């Protein structure tokens, strides 16, 4: 397994990061099987594991913690906070109040006294970034966290966070975790260049585009009836995306590779990508992914991929890496109705 430096942290991580979102009720409910998969990945050279408190509402972190007993020192362990964790208005988000509470829960479930990489899971429009960075800085100084990062942030918020850290003498975000795949290349426009500018490590999620780049889901073919497919079925309504998959399948076949291996090699070929997160649900899926870990693509193949999905573009609006709240929330685009009525 190839090793790469995680930004400027000095930490070396594997080119594949084991993602655990589908360990537990969100995919594979057999905890022992999930533990065996984690051990298999470690035995095959993967030293980077990513999870989150919200995955399975704490179930997944507990599985990871069980698997790492006796092997903690082998792993660069990353987790995330910010998602809603039960009842109550303050059990989520990026406030200091929640950050210091969330990390204690993660440490307990993971069975460790420190987290290598603690990440803000999503943008939080209700909390000043200085509030969050100040709390995270205290965690680093307390030895509970080694490095801090973000996930799903737009380029503007990454820049703002770097500026605030420098101005206030706070620890910097050292990584970003965006979605990136052949079908979702929007981050090549701003996010990846910004990460390069500030020396951030980049771990990308969904390099297989929610499974579309496995070749399992074909145009005009029956769709599997399972919980995961029901969750991502909205991504199968875009004919342009399915057309691209057919072209990519042909390209992969001509090159003598599976589409899965082609897609993973594409994601790790970008010079600003440190590690690509794999999310296997079964041991067979994990073994197949690891088999292709050494594949690299030549310029001829990458040029053909560019012709199918041009650099910096997405196929379909559902793949946009970050949609500002100013677009999704009408209250941020329209004055209150009573004000508009009074102005008539």
Residue spans of the language-model regions?
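N-terminal binding-site loop/beta-alpha segment at the start of enzyme catalytic domains
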Residues: 1-76, 343-344
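Conserved, mostly hydrophobic/aromatic
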Residues: 6, 18, 34, 49, ...
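Short, well-ordered coil/turn segments that N-cap beta-strands
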Residues: 11-16, 45-47, 71-75, 111-116, ...
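Active-site beta-loop-alpha junctions enriched in small/polar residues
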Residues: 21, 52-54, 80-84, 120-123, ...
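Glycine/proline-rich, positively charged
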Residues: 26-27, 86-186, 190
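Generic structural signal for well-ordered alpha-helices
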Residues: 38, 61, 65, 103-107, ...
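Aromatic-lined glycan-binding groove of carbohydrate-active enzymes
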Residues: 187-223, 258
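Terminal-tail/helix-coil boundary detector
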Residues: 223-250, 254, 272-273, 287-344
């Amino acid at each position: 397994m190839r090793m790469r430096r995680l930004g400027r942290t000095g930490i070396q991580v594997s080119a594949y990061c084991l993602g655990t979102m589908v360990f537990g009720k969100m995919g594979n409910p057999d905890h022992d099987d999930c533990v065996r998969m984690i051990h298999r990945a470690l035995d095959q050279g993967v030293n980077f594991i990513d999870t989150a408190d919200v995955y399975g509402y704490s179930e997944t972190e507990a599985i990871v913690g069980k698997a790492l007993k006796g092997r903690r020192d082998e792993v660069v362990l990353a987790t995330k906070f910010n998602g809603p964790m039960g009842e109550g208005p303050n059990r989520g988000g990026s406030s200091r109040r929640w950050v210091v509470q969330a990390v204690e829960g993660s440490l307990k479930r993971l069975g460790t006294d420190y987290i290598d990489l603690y990440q803000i899971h999503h943008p939080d429009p209700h909390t000043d970034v200085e509030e969050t960075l100040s709390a995270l800085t205290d965690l680093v100084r307390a030895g509970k966290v080694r490095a801090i990062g973000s996930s799903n942030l737009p380029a503007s918020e990454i820049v703002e966070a770097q500026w605030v850290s420098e101005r206030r003498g706070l620890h910097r975000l050292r990584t970003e975790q965006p979605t990136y795949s052949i079908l979702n290349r929007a981050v090549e426009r701003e996010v990846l260049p910004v990460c390069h500018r500030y020396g951030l490590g980049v771990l990308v999620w969904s390099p297989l585009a929610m499974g579309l780049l496995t070749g399992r889901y074909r145009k005009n073919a029956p769709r599997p009836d399972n919980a995961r497919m029901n969750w991502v079925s909205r991504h199968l309504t875009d004919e342009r995306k399915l057309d691209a998959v057919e072209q990519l399948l042909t390209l992969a076949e001509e090159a003598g590779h599976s589409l899965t291996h082609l897609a993973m090699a594409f994601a790790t070929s970008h010079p600003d990508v440190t590690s690509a997160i794999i999310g296997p649900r079964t041991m067979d899926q994990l073994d197949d992914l690891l088999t292709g870990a050494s594949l690299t693509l030549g310029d001829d193949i990458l040029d053909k991929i560019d012709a199918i999905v041009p650099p910096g573009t997405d196929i379909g609006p559902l793949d946009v890496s970050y949609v500002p709240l100013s677009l999704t929330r009408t209250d941020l685009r329209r004055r209150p109705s009573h004000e508009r009525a009074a102005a008539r």
